[in-house]
Amino acid sequence: MEKNRNRSSLQSDGQRVRDTGAGPKRAISLKDVIALIVGVVIGTGIFKTPSMIAANTGREDLFFLAWLAGGIISLIGALCYAELATAYPHSGGDYHYLTRAFGRRIGFLFVWSRMTVIQPGSIAMLAFVLADYLSTILPLGRSAHFLAAAIPVAFLTALNLMGVQKGTRAQNLLTGIKVVGLFAVVLAGVIIPPSSSPGAPVPPHPGASFGLAMVFVLLTFGGWNEAAYLSAEMYEVRRNMVRALLWGVGIITAVYLLMNLAYWRGLGLEEMGQSEAVAADLMRRILGEGGARFISLLIIVSALGAINASIFTGARTNYAMGRDFSIFSFLGKWQERSNTPMNALLFMGAISLMWVLLGSFARKGFVAMVEYTAPVFWCFFLLAGLSLFVLRIKEPEVSRPFLVPLYPFIPFFFCMTCVYMLRSSVAYVGGGAFVGLAVLAAGAVLLLLKRSPSQEGPG
C-alpha cells in the first residue's frame, strides 16, 4: 500500500508540474551536458593529485595503470547512472532514486546533506583553490583572500539567476578555454624538450600504496554523476543522457592520461612525487615564470568552470527538495521568465558563501572542505549504486531505455568501490568527518520534529 501511494504521489507531482507549466523545461542540449560533466570533473585536482599518486605508486607502469583504472571505474559508474537517469528523469537526480528505492526519510537526509554540506562544501573548496592561485599572480592579504574566494561564487550565482542559457553558455565557454589550455600543457610537456634534466631520485614515499593512490585518482575523477540532475531539462534525455555520460567520462579519461604523460615526460616520476605544484613546475621548467603564471590562470579558469557547474546542478536538488517538503517550499519555485529555480540558486549561493567564510578561519580552507564533505558524499554515492538493485526489484514495470550490461556484476563492482572509498575517506580525514556527520544528524532531528514525510510530497 505504501509503495503504491509513493508511486502515485510521484506521478501526481510530475503531472502537477506539467499542468501548471511551472517547472523545468527542456532547454539543455547534449553538448551542454558534456561541457558540464567535463567542467565539473576537471576542476583543480589534475593540477595537484598527480604528485600524490606518483609518490604512492613509485613506478611508471603502476602510475598510468592507476589513472586508467580510474577511468574504467568512472565508466562503470556512468553506466549505472545512465540506467537510473533514463528510467527516472528528474531534477532531483540521486535524491529521486534514493527516495523511490529507500523511502522519503533517506531521500530527505541525502538532499539535506547535499544542500548543506556536499555541494556548498565542494564549491567553497574550489573557491579556495581559485584564491590560492590568484595570490600567486596578485599579492593578497587575509581579507582579500577571502574576497577572492567569495566574489566568484556570488558572481556565478548571479549569472545563473539571469537564465539557464546564460549558465550553460558560460559553462561551454569556460570548459572550452580549459580544454584548450590543458592541451597546450600536453603539447609543452610532450613536444617541447625540457630545459633541464629531471630532478634526482628521491626515497620512496613512506606510506606508499596503490590503494591510497586510487583514493586520489577517484577523487580527481569525481563529479560526472552531476549530469543526472539535468535529466528533467535535457533534450531527448532517454537517448542523450547515455551519450553524455559516456562521452564526458571518455574525454576526461583521455585528458587525464595525456596530462600525466606530459608531467612524466617533462619531470620524471621521481620529481613528480616530490612536487607541490606539478603543473606549475613543468611549465616553469619549459617556459620560465611566464609558464608558471599561465598555469595559475588555467587553474583559475578551471575552478570557475567547476564552481559554475556545481552551482547549476546543486540548485536543481534544492528545487526538488522544495517541491517535496513543505518546510522548504520556498525553494520549490521555478522562475518562468529566466527558466531557473531562482530561490534554490540564491540559497545555494548563500550556503556556499557561508562555507567560504567558515573555511577562511581554518588553517587550510581546501583541506577543511575535503574533511567535511568526503565521508558523507561516499556514503550516499554507495546508496545510489544500491538503489539500482532495489529499483529493479521494486519497480520492474518501469521502462528502462538503457540497461547496465553484465548486470549484476558491473553495479556490484561500483558499489564495492564506493565502500572502499567510504572507508578510505573516513581514515584519511579523521576528526574532520564529524562536522559533516553533525550536519547529517541535524537533518535527522529536523525530520523527527516535523510531520511524517509520508504526508509530504514525494521526491
Where does each model-flagged region fall?
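Helix-loop-helix junctions that connect adjacent transmembrane segments
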Residues: 19-24, 60, 64, 141-147, ...
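Membrane-interface "cap" regions at the ends of multi-pass membrane proteins
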Residues: 1-51, 55-60, 74-79, 90-91, ...
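Helix-loop-helix connectors at the membrane interface of multi-pass transporters/channels
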Residues: 2-3, 7-12, 17, 95-107, ...
